[in-house]
Amino acid sequence: GLYYQSPFYKELRQQQIDEKGNHVTVLNKDIKSQRALHFILGADYTFKAADRNFKLSAELYYKKLDPINPYTVDNVKIRYYGDNCAKGYAMGMDVKFFGEFVPGTDSWISFSLMKSEQTIGETTKAPLPNSPSYNVSLFFQDYFPGYKRVKLNLKGVVAGGLPQTIPGQGYEAGYFRTPAYKRVDIGLSYQLAGGNDAIMDKGLFRHLKNIWIGADVFNLFGIKNVSSYYWITDAYNVQYAVPNYLTGRQFNARLIVDF
């Protein structure tokens, strides 16, 4: 596939230094659409084991990117170079194993590898923003032994860190990656009504399929994942990166009604 992304206003903004040494912003009217040439190969394999359904999916991809208008990310602020001064690529693989590890429930595990690189100018090489080098995720469900009204689910993810740069400077000044992202969630659900329950034939319940209540613990182990950095400059003009952390452990209650 061939994809073109038309530039929008932020991509036209270019930082320059005037004759007085001041930083000014001008609009680069010569910006071109960024282009991506995709090569993707995928396959699915469906099979049965122990009278249960399973599916294995795999995908390989290579994406040639040019001309790139590079950008840096500072917390939630995105700043483009304002120039088509780079070219690059992204390539990798995704594998997902999906199936009924426990009869009547859906669970999966996935694994991804990715390598991305952009060459800015002719010499500076750096990864693309928002590009972790790996990701491992799983989602597992099980019933309480002998009582299918109680369901347990477990979610987990481990992903590589994202590239970071010094605010106000591009990749030419260097970059580093945040620590790996790690998180585990656990949840418990109870079916209040559904299926062949007598109440499902009465009143408004006739229009419903299932009613579940549940409780979750997000970020079960209270892991401090870094979302971005707050930069501090001391009296000697040395900058220090102070991490900003994502939300820690949280508790959640839910009600699910299936129509």
Model-identified regions with their sequence ranges:
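Outer-membrane beta-barrel strand-turn architecture
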Residues: R35, F47-A50, K64, G99-T105, ...
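Gram-negative outer-membrane beta-barrel transporters
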Residues: K55, E59-K64, Y81-I166
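Membrane-embedded beta-barrel scaffold of Gram-negative outer-membrane proteins
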Residues: G1, Q5, D30-N84, Y89, ...
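C-terminal beta-signal and adjacent terminal beta-strands/loops
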Residues: Q5, S107, V157-P167, Y190-F259
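Residues on the lipid-exposed face of transmembrane beta-strands in outer-membrane beta-barrel proteins
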Residues: L2, I31, L41-Y45, M93-G99, ...
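Transmembrane beta-strands of outer-membrane beta-barrel pores
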Residues: L2-S6, Q15-Q16, Y45-F47, L60-P67, ...
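Residues that define the transmembrane beta-barrel architecture of outer-membrane proteins
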Residues: R35-F39, Y62, K87-M91, N130-V136, ...
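Outer-membrane beta-barrel translocator domains and adjoining extracellular loop/strand segments
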Residues: Y9-Q16, N22-H23, I68-V76, M114, ...
